[in-house]
Amino acid sequence: VPLSPVCGSDGVTYDSECALKLMRCMIQKDLHVVMLSPCKDASPSSVPELHCSRSVYGCCRDNVTAAQGVGLAGCPSTCECNRYGSYSKTCSPSSGQCSCKPGVGGLKCDRCEPGFWNFRGIVTDEKSGCTPCNCYPLGAVRDDCEQMSGLCSCKAGISGMKCNQCPNGSKLGPSGCDQDPSVSRTCSDLHCQYGATCVQSIGRAYCECPPSICPKNKQFKVCGSDGVTYANECQLKTIACRQGSVINILHQGPCQGTTPSTGNIQTTDLTPSPKEHTNLSKIVSLETIPILKAIFPVTDNTTGPQVHKMYTVTASPGVIGHPTAGWPPSSLTSSEPPDLSGSGDFSGDTDLEASGNLEGSGVEPMGFNESSTGPPTPVPNERSTCDNTEFGCCSDGKTPSVDGEGSNCPPTKLFQGVLIVEEVEGQELFYTPEMDDPKSELFGETARSIENALNELFGNSNVKKDFKSVRVHGLGPSDPVRIIVEVHFDPRTSYNSHDVQRALLQQVKQSRRKSIVVKKPEQDNVKIVDFDWAPLLFTTTSTTAARTTVPITTASALPVTRRPPPATTRWPKVLPHAKVPSTTTKPATTRRPPFSRKVEVRPATVKVHRPCDSQPCLHGGTCEDDGVSYTCSCPAGRGGAVCERTIVYFIPEFGGRSYLAFKTMKAYYTVRISMEFRASNLDGLPLVQWTEKGKGLHFYRPSEGYVELRFNHGVWDGVITSKTLIKPGNWHHVVGNRNRRSGMLSVDGEPHLIGESPPGTDGLNLDTDLFLGGTPEDEMTLVTERTTATKGLQGCIRLLDVNNLIYDLQERSNDVLYGSGVGECGNNPCSPNPCKNRGKCHMKEAEMFHCESVGEFSGPTCADKHNPCDPNPCHQSANCMVLPEGGSKCECPMGREGELCERVSEAEQDQGKAFIPEFNGLSYLEMNGIHTFVSDLLQKLSMEVIFLAKDPNGMIFYNGQKTDGRGDFVSLNLRDGYLEFKYDLGKGAAVLRSKAPIPLNVWNVVTVERNGRKGLMKINKDELVSGESPKSRKAPHTALNLKEAFYVGGAPDFNKFARAAGIISGFTGAIQKLSLKSIPLLKKENIRNAMEISNFRWHACTKTRNPCQNGGVCSPRLREYDCMCQRGFSGPQCEKALEEKSASGSESVAFNGRTFIEYHNTVTRSEKAVQVNYFEMSIKTEATKGLILWSGKIAEKSDYIALAVVDGFVQMTYDLGSKPVTLRSTIPVNTNQWVRIKANRIHGYGTLQVGNEAPVTGSSPFAATQLDTDGALWLGGIEKLAPGNRLPKAYSTGFIGCIKDVVIDRQELQLVEDALNNPTILHCPAKK
């Protein structure tokens, strides 16, 4: 097209004919070129228009339009141009061709041209023309597409709406799907647009649109720049991303403008809406955002003529799209006005008719034959043309409705059904309250998607010959969404509801293309019944009289009964005399024969969700299920409805199932016990007991108001009963002694009562914990067998004296190992009433209560009118937790953040950032057990942790042997600010406790070690704590046996931990380093599961801007950091570029195994006491051993640091006077290629990096931090090592190879000029 000015028929000069056509498209009016030059001064618009009677051919029948030829040629009555597909009512007088909108074809502009679709969008959405199919040529069979959805016909093995997707990340090429290494594997290779975020999964990276869920503070409607009202800001962003378009928020609240109904659109003046200028059909490439688009019409249930709106919905990336199944073709018996004929009618253009049939049907053209493996893919049948009409189809799927009431629709036989659906067209369904409104856009989108999927399944089932259509009647909350549908069949069909249900189930299970996913087991979640049995299943207000019905085409807002909570789900009853309101549908014109046989409707078997399934109890509380609700039994120090409150007690109170545990007491021959208690009732409850595997039981308990002392030496019990009656509510003092087989008991100073056990052994071995007030549930069985007592004390204990040692019973005591259900004596947790909304408070154990709801309120404290987690407001990968104070909290998996876990975390997006996990008290990391990382864990353990704590309580790590509260374990835990390192080897726990509280909000370095029974904990390199586990005379108990997972920062259920660990809360803070024998554990590839983990934002290495330049990797070092520079750069921030020097230059020195060069250990001077070392150098060698660098003293048992090649790998070894530390690289260097080495030491912490490998780290096990040297540094080797160093032979062998670009303490070392001795210095050859 020539780019010269032209004059338009509107009298305006345009820069070119293209500019004129663009304007014509935008204003949606007839505009053509009248002059191939600029318009003259007297524009055509200024000339008065002549009446048609004065034209050459006179007027048309409307007496307004001028005829274009003889015989009313070109007049609207003759042309019959479709008013939606054409620009005007007139046509060419010679050919009769109307002026069509873009993509519209046919003489009358009443159909989409080949390669275009969505004629209906011109009518309902005022689109500027038909939408291009954009079928991908390498994956599609044809260029045209299915007219209702835009779905292209794909070749075998290719999927996607536009046939542009291959499975498993393969690339679509001329020969089909081929594996392509260029497919994005990581997010660094992928650029996401339109608000999408990159997600890595199964070796692929893809773009994921944000969820449509919104926080409460954003739950208000907004008006988009496309003229559409959205439920909230989040829905707008989601739809914009799915459409691949930019939609901005114009203002809060609904859009003011309304879309005119079709009845009000004038042919002569069709005003474009803002939507006309927005390309809603934009296709984003697979490499950018692999999305799948499907079109779902929304029915606008308003008075007057019905308008169908089209909205674009995008499925999840990589989801296979499916064509919409139709029904057998048949001729229409009713005529239709030509302006509503849509794209399926005959247009008069015989050349385009065949193509139009194909584009409407999706059937492959004749002659096409492509071999494929696997079961045949269902091919959609021809769709009826009524889908493109103004009021859509009747329930028979063929007849076009002439009005919104469907007054002309033929009768159908109606079945109703309910399905519990999880996915539709690859999109996971989540219920939202907006789905209750049949007028909402969300209801329309979801319903249309479900109808398309079910139409496809029924259209390929064994009942398809009588099947007509499916209509969605209602959406309701379930697990996740309950769908109520109407299934329409031929009124003369012989199929019953069982046949229909069986056919649908068969398709759901066997269909290869999963257009709809029903919750498993499918047979329990699909139910079809006859229409007159529908109230039993749905309890809707549908009439039960009409068994054959004429459905209307508008959405019917039938109320749907919400299901009660899962624990109380019951099937609704039908009242025999209940009056059911009738619907607005017309009476049926035909009826089926009366229903003659009884149909038994059996409710589907639904998995019963127990109240404790969601693990509602916090901080290690035990959930107890009563079948309707739950209560939490809290550990000592916790209380509240779900153990959310911190309890501080001074005099412990026990509730019958409570207890406190202490260390095992020594009572082999003698023991003296004194205690003071107050009981609230007298039903034979134990006060204190301790056992040894069922033998030897010492036990106090009130029996009918009297205290008993029992002791057993292995055969029979010795029993002494007091004579003083115990009075409820009074304090009593009890003293008991045992000396071998003799015992004594006295209550409140009464005369001593003497007794003895039967003859046997005199000694009593006790090896379990001492329990006060009761026992753990699993220990109570043994107590019941020996004493008939079934519960613990209900009351208070203020004194316990064992062998003249008074135990501290307070909550923060060091004597208490662990406990459960203990509170302050005299406290009433129900005063004041913690239950909201008039809930009734029931006191349970001490400091614990249960709220009984009144009315419709629920939750731990009756704070919520509805379950805030049903439906789940969180992202699909997150867990929803009901809060005791009301509302909910989303527990995000690792990689997601935000109030609703709606965002991908920054650390997940930037894989180059350092990973410093931050914990919030409910977070945890789960890994494989530490026994899987090292082989010699049984006898020895060495771990280092660098952490920053924000709360004085919380678990740092735990690994155990069992999940029943017993067994071996190792743990590190903060308790009241003190750090506790515990391990149990089978005889009892060793407890190593810090001498002072750990400082908060600063980085702490802790090293824990175990060798046999002996343990050591070093804190911040200056505090040393030692201890050992209990010993046994029968077994050594020196091995640590671990079998379970390793948890960091917390766990999903603390009840599975060993009770002796005393862990009841998660860690709050950040963990910078966690290593096991220098093996770093905090790597993402080691993590099996994670919850509520985010990256610590307050360290330089995790901030948005990387402090290391030129691609350097930031390595955290407490508050500071080190930069691991890429090759060719050096400096603290890798800001210096190293010049590449010639290999024959003076700075590339060759070493022959006898060349030993001496330097100052800090380049310019000698330092005798060094806290920090930093080395960088490049080496080239073929040798498998040789000493590269040495700094230290040449004396026995002296400090040193060294670099050497050992077995072809670089090793860094240093000894600060306590124990040598060896770091070994994983990259071989004996390749005769230049390799860069970086090594540093900060106090006892060392790092080694060779090439681009991940740094290898380690630390000195004891408190030494200083390297004492003679001030010298040697390259290439040393004359003689001290005999006591016990280093490998490689350290006493000289280095053979080349060394260059040496950096010492971040200063360049001149290999020749800075040398202190004068050896023969050789140079490397010029050829590298």
Swiss-Prot record:
PROSITE patterns linked: ASX_HYDROXYL, EGF_1, EGF_2, EGF_3, EGF_LAM_1, EGF_LAM_2, KAZAL_2, LAM_G_DOMAIN
Listed GO CC annotations: basement membrane; extracellular region
Start and end residues of each Kazal-like domain: 1-41, 201-257
Record-linked InterPro entries: ConA-like_dom_sf, EGF-like_Ca-bd_dom, EGF-like_dom, EGF-type_Asp/Asn_hydroxyl_site, FacI_MAC, Fol_N, Kazal_dom, Kazal_dom_sf
This protein's UniProt keywords: Developmental protein, Differentiation, Disulfide bond, EGF-like domain, Glycoprotein, Laminin EGF-like domain, Repeat
Glycosylation sites per record: N63, N168, N279, N301, N369
Protein name according to UniProt: Agrin
Gene: AGRN
